[in-house]
């Protein structure tokens, strides 16, 4: 498959092993896993960080295989979800850091272009989340207010 902003093929990467059932060696107690997810979320970890902690420290290679639900779904069920989805928040943070870099390095043309591409991704993602009702209907990405939104 081609890359998003380049007209060439991507590079190969590792693939997660195909499994339909939980490995015998893993921790597969559903209540314990869900409780750990809620506890880690209340401690301030993102869903991606929760997955890494469960994999590395608690022997849960795949939460969806063990519980039948994704980490995000478990977080939403317990009303611990943030107002801005995690992937959108990460892209907005990336764009904000690029803007701060460009304030000091105005002639950095490569970064200017990368900022345009990143903000285009943000706008596409906002359009998707407004359509799926994860964001309110009139929600629009504005670079001026992004820092205030991310500080919450």
Curated annotation (Swiss-Prot):
Record keywords: Ribonucleoprotein, Ribosomal protein
Q: Which SMART domains match?
A: Ribosomal_S13_N, Ribosomal_S15
Keyword Manganese included in the entry's annotation: no
UniProt GO MF annotations: small ribosomal subunit rRNA binding; structural constituent of ribosome
Q: Which cysteines are joined by disulfide bonds?
A: none
- List GO BP terms, alphabetically: translation
The UniProt entry's GO CC annotations, sorted and at most eight, read:
cytosolic small ribosomal subunit
Any Pfam family the entry gives? Ribosomal_S15
Give yes or no: UniProt keyword Ribonucleoprotein.
yes
Source superkingdom: Archaea
Q: Which family does it belong to?
A: Belongs to the universal ribosomal protein uS15 family.
Which HAMAP family does the entry link to?
Answer: Ribosomal_uS15_A (MF_01343_A)
Describe, as the record does, how this protein assembles with itself and its partners. Part of the 30S ribosomal subunit.
Protein's recorded name: Small ribosomal subunit protein uS15
- Gene source species: Methanocorpusculum labreanum (strain ATCC 43576 / DSM 4855 / Z)
Q: Which gene encodes it?
A: rps15
């Amino acid at each position: 498959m081609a890359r998003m902003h380049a007209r060439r093929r991507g590079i190969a990467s590792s693939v997660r092993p195909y499994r339909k059932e939980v490995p015998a060696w893993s921790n597969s107690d559903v209540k314990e896993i869900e409780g750990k997810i809620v506890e880690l979320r209340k401690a301030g970890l993102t869903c991606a960080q929760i997955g890494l902690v469960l994999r590395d420290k608690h022997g849960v290679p795949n939460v969806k295989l063990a519980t039948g639900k994704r980490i995000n779904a478990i977080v939403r069920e317990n009303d611990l979800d943030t107002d801005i989805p995690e992937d959108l928040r990460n892209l907005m943070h990336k764009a904000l850091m690029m803007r701060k870099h460009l304030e000091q390095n105005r002639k950095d043309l490569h970064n200017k272009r990368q900022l345009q591409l990143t903000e285009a991704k943000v706008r596409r993602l906002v359009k998707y989340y407004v359509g799926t009702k994860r964001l309110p209907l009139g929600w629009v990405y504005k670079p001026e207010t992004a820092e205030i939104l991310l500080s919450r």
